[in-house]
Amino acid sequence: MTRGKNSFTPGTPLPDHWFHILLALADDKRHGLGILQEVTEQTGGHIQVWPGMLYLALKRMTDEGLVSETEAPADFVTGGGRPRFYRITPLGVRACKAEADRHARLVNAARAKRILRKDP
């Protein structure tokens, strides 16, 4: 999916781990470990993004304009190093919404085919 800097078009299907990373950043900026923990929590442990995969994705997502590095919160205390914090960009929000809408259409299609019930 590497097309070049800021060439991402919302509506283009995202890799699953990109979608989960954007969801993790949708409500707050986070550092790498915080993103990993949020993805694990929001998926009930069914999706795990490994550190190498995360940082490669963050690099590519930054190049595409979906996320950007940002300052650590003022109250953030480190145990030594200086973790990088990331936030979702307006383009990232649009891409995340488009992907969520795409997933919703797939769920609706599965319900129409009686693969899924309407009530969870």
What does each of the following model-derived ranges do?
Residues 1-15:
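A detector for short, charged/polar N-terminal pre-domain segments
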Residues 2-3, 91-120:
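Amphipathic alpha-helical dimerization/coiled-coil segments
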Residues 11-53:
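N-terminal helix-turn-helix DNA-binding core of bacterial DNA-binding proteins
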Residues 32-33, 46, 70-74, 83-85:
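A short, glycine- and basic residue-enriched loop/turn
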Residues 54-61:
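Basic amphipathic alpha-helical segments that dock to polyanions
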Residues 62-79, 87:
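Beta-hairpin "wing" of winged helix-turn-helix
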Residues 77-99:
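Basic, amphipathic "hinge/linker" alpha-helix immediately C-terminal to the N-terminal HTH DNA-binding motif
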